[in-house]
Amino acid sequence: VPMFNVRKAVYKDARKIADVHVSSWKSVYKDVIDEQDMSNITVENRTALWETVLKVPLNGQFVLVLENDREEIVGFISGGRERTKRYGYDGEIYTLYLLDDYQKKGLGGLLLHAFSKEMKVHGYDSLLVWVLTKNPASKFYRKYGAKRVEAEIVTIGDGTYQETAFGWQHIDALLNQFHA
């Protein structure tokens, strides 16, 4: 059985995180987001983004990476304070991505579990996540007990897309999913 390790991301991980981000983005959204609207998602601009996040975290943001037994980053999760302040949730998952070959193996759950434990340690009580409505990931969050909160329209490139928020009102309820 291959071993996986979850750890806190450091600055030098930015490029690898960007690789995973762009590669998963393109495979997850190829049928959801217009190619033109996706064209500005490049490894270069994502690397710059993650370097900034890891150097100067805003909103109490932190990033966890998932490494395989060769210490290659194959997935990551990030989050921090809930950004809209509209729904009464204090924490938010900003991103969760895994390379294609590592999906459907329980590794998203591994990241989600590690992240929610970390959020609880940081004093968060609840958790929200926004997912493009047509993204199959909404099933993943539902499987772990998230409830639909709200939907709104977002702009990506020149296109508009619907996003749905899912939430856990109590992080403990999410943590309990992993001890069942």
Give the role of each language-model region.
Residues 1-15, 172-180:
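Conserved N-terminal entry element of GNAT/NAT acetyltransferase domains
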Residues 11-12, 22-32, 38-101, 112-114, ...:
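Acetyl-CoA-dependent GNAT
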Residues 106:
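Conserved G/P- and acidic residue-centered "switch" motifs that form tight phosphate/ATP-binding loops
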Residues 119-130:
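Conserved GNAT acetyl-CoA-binding A-motif
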Residues 128-132, 142, 147-164:
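Conserved catalytic-core motifs of GNAT/GCN5-like acyltransferases
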Residues 137:
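Helix-turn-helix
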